[in-house]
A protein has these predicted regions:
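Ligand-binding pockets and gating/stacking loops
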Residues: 1-282
Length: 282
């Protein structure tokens, strides 16, 4: 989606999730910053970018364009021009003053420092909030990390709990405990966006098992949509009440198309599936 947007922030997209969940237009996985840790993610968003490196890349592309063979030249020119535009925008942003932002880049999984408990998901959401507030990115991706089971007192990680929660009540209770934590983090994030007067201009999409034993379905996945100026409806049941086991009456692909519409991207389908939820959400 970000490739359809005019770049109005330092980066068009920032992927800090811990899974392969983002792909580019060529179906290649977008590398994540997650493994770099919070300090380097913060430096990526709020650190100085050497302009000489970008200028050298621009110069190299210009030199390579001049040396293109006449045969099939047109097939390469468009790609070179796209890279030049991207680098020129990157250079423009690199020359702008970087906002001075205070942020604790250390992980505090237990409150040994008197500064409160901070786990990776809370930290990532706070990085996203600051990134939005100070125009460091337009599209952000994060995901609840592989949790430290000892900190939460559960016997499995979140993903494993989603597979086992239907087996016995105690395992379901563990998944519920984790999801209450994740949704608590999300609630605080939304509250902070609202305080910053950013929520109405920020589309927030959050998915998970939501303590449903029937999780891991790509078609029927509990999904929370917040902000973005939508006409929010509360709970929207996607199954057809007259035929619960039949095709869904509202699909995730339709939701994605409506989100793209709200972002100003005029598309009528997502992944080959047509339709939208505009009549419900806008």
């Amino acid at each position: 989606a970000c490739e359809h947007l005019q770049q109005l922030t330092r980066y068009k997209s920032v992927h800090m999730g811990n899974k392969t969940i983002v792909w580019n237009k060529n179906s290649r996985a977008v590398p994540t910053l997650h493994e770099l840790g919070p300090e380097k993610i913060f430096d990526h968003l709020f650190g100085e970018t050497p302009t000489d490196v970008i200028e050298q890349k621009l110069k190299s592309i210009g030199t390579m364009r001049q040396s293109l063979p006449q045969q099939n030249r047109a097939a390469y020119v468009a790609s070179f021009e796209e890279h030049e535009r991207t680098l020129a925008t990157d250079l423009e942003w690199a020359k702008k003053p970087v906002p001075k932002v205070e942020f604790d880049t250390k992980l505090h999984l237990t409150d040994h420092h008197g500064r409160g408990v901070l786990d990776p998901f809370q930290q990532h959401l706070e990085l996203i909030r600051l990134g939005i507030k100070y125009r460091r990115g337009q599209v952000f991706v994060a995901s609840p990390p592989f949790v430290d089971k000892t900190d939460y007192g559960v016997g499995y990680g979140y993903h494993a709990l989603g597979h086992r929660a239907h087996l016995e009540k105690s395992i379901f209770g563990e998944m519920l405990m984790l999801e209450q934590h994740f949704l608590g983090c999300l609630s605080d994030f939304l509250t902070d966006l609202k305080k910053d007067q950013l929520l109405d201009d920020t589309i927030v999409l959050f998915m998970g098992a939501f303590s449903s034993p029937g999780g891991h379905s790509r078609e029927y996945l509990p999904t929370l949509l917040a902000g973005g100026g939508f006409d929010h409806q509360g709970l929207v049941e996607c199954r057809n009440p007259s035929n619960p086991d039949g095709p869904l009456q509202h699909t995730l692909s339709q939701l994605y198309v409506s989100i793209l519409h709200q972002m100003g991207i005029d598309l009528n389908e997502f992944s080959g599936h047509e339709g939208n939820l505009d009549k419900i959400l806008t």
